[in-house]
Regions:
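RNase H-like nuclease module associated with reverse transcription
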Residues: 12-13, 52-166
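RNase H-like nuclease fold core
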Residues: 8, 13-59
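Amphipathic alpha-helical
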Residues: 1-5
Length: 166
């Protein structure tokens, strides 16, 4: 019996879930970013980290998390291509904040805060270059939710069940 797969995978999908918990740290006021990246159905990257600057809005926290997710998508595409895996479809990044989704998908949107404006242009550049595609997802279905805030046992069990069976 041969345990080594004999088929080469022609192409893999990249799916990234990102979330933020605004002003999670009560001492510093910094938000927390959570990201889980899947190549195919396998989680290959996950991280929960405190954001480096204080955001004054939930939108700012979520958009900062989206920018980090785009950086992960770009890196994963590079690594996979360097191993000879074809990547022709954009990486899908799932966000649960409707305002972030609408602004990231709208090239006519403008942001006033300079740091967010730069993050916006970074995200938009990769959307227009067909490197990433932003998708909206319900908060209950966002795998990264468990990396940003404590969940009750039922929510955690449901999320882990979905995570392990998909």
């Amino acid at each position: 019996m041969n345990s080594v797969p004999n088929k080469k995978v022609k192409e893999l999908d990249i799916n990234i879930f990102c979330d933020a918990d605004h002003a999670h740290d009560l001492v510093t006021g910094r938000s927390v970013t959570g990201i889980i990246a899947f190549v195919g159905s396998t989680p290959v990257y996950w991280k929960s980290t405190r954001q480096t600057s204080v955001q004054t809005s939930t939108f700012g926290s979520e958009f900062t998390a989206l920018k980090k997710a785009v950086e992960v998508a770009v890196s994963l595409r590079y690594y996979l291509r360097s191993m000879g895996v074809q990547i022709s479809k954009p990486a899908k990044i799932y966000v649960d904040n409707k305002s972030v989704f609408l602004n990231a998908a709208n090239p006519a949107s403008s942001l006033n805060k300079k740091a967010l404006a730069l993050a916006y242009h970074f995200v938009r550049e990769h959307v227009s270059g067909n490197v990433i595609e932003i998708q909206h997802i319900r908060s209950e279905d966002n795998y990264a939710d468990c990396l940003t805030k404590p969940l009750n046992s039922t929510m955690l069990r449901n999320l882990l069940y979905e995570f392990m069976t998909n």
